[in-house]
Amino acid sequence: MSAPQDRTDDGGVPVPVTPAGATGGAPAELPPSSPAGRGMFGDQGTGDVSGYGGLVRPQRSIEAATRPYGGYFDEVADALEEAYPAFGEAIEKVVVDRGELTLHIRPERIAEVCQVMRDDLSLRFELCSSVSGVDYLGADACRLHVVYQLTSMTYRRQVRLEAAVSAENPHLPSVTSVYPTADWQERETYDMFGVIFDGHPGLTRILMPDDWEGHPQRKDYPLGGVPVEYKGAEIPPPDRRRSYQ
């Protein structure tokens, strides 16, 4: 498949296809770092990082982008705003980072936005290739984020949608009626993170047993273990240092 060619606007001025910040496959310049995090996953406990090899990682602060976003990103935003009357209320912020576009959506609006993204002729995001969860423990009240990767095979474009809910009220509308491919992926996100997708046709666990307690990829989920025997020697279960509490 040949590389996409630059287009021109109505005045004949070339408009680059490559989004702003992208540098021919290399990541765009990173935003400023906030104070470094120590340990793993924002552990706020004793500060004992011996189990992680003394890992120290920078924490980046990603701010909302301003116009122009660059390339087709502005076209996508304009088309969605024109096709969806509740655009101003539904879109919490727009982020352009490392040459990728992410639209942060109010949780109750996610299914509506997906419907417009799929059906509008100027958008045509026919495929939801991924639904996944992220736990930003300690970041804010809405720590559970669900990420939707949308692809337009018509226009060869990709956009990411993201919605955030709290651990106390982890409800999101299911998008399975719009994207059937989201069925098992929503089940996995429910299983691992405890996000409840209202309207899903069969929201049951998909990896863990039905009677399993808790959601293993939440960062406040304690590690456990069972004793294992090796050649007559009994190895005790691991400690619970990574309980993230």
Swiss-Prot record:
Keyword set includes Nucleotide-binding: no
Disulfide-bond pairs as recorded: none
InterPro entries: NADH_DH_suC, NADH_quin_OxRdtase_su_C/D-like, NADH_UbQ_OxRdtase_30kDa_su
Compositionally biased spans, kind Gly residues: 39-54
Catalyzed reaction equations: a quinone + NADH + 5 H(+)(in) = a quinol + NAD(+) + 4 H(+)(out)
Region of interest (Disordered), residue spans: 1-54, 216-245
GO annotations of cellular component type: plasma membrane
Domain of life: Bacteria
Bilayer-spanning residue ranges: none
Membrane topology type: Peripheral membrane protein
Enzyme class: translocase
Biased segments, Basic and acidic residues type: 1-10
Pfam families (alphabetical): Complex1_30kDa
Tagged with keyword NAD: yes
Family: Belongs to the complex I 30 kDa subunit family.
Annotated HAMAP family: NDH1_NuoC (MF_01357)
Quaternary organization: NDH-1 is composed of 14 different subunits. Subunits NuoB, C, D, E, F, and G constitute the peripheral sector of the complex.
Protein name: NADH-quinone oxidoreductase subunit C
Organismal lineage: Bacteria, Bacillati, Actinomycetota, Actinomycetes, Micromonosporales
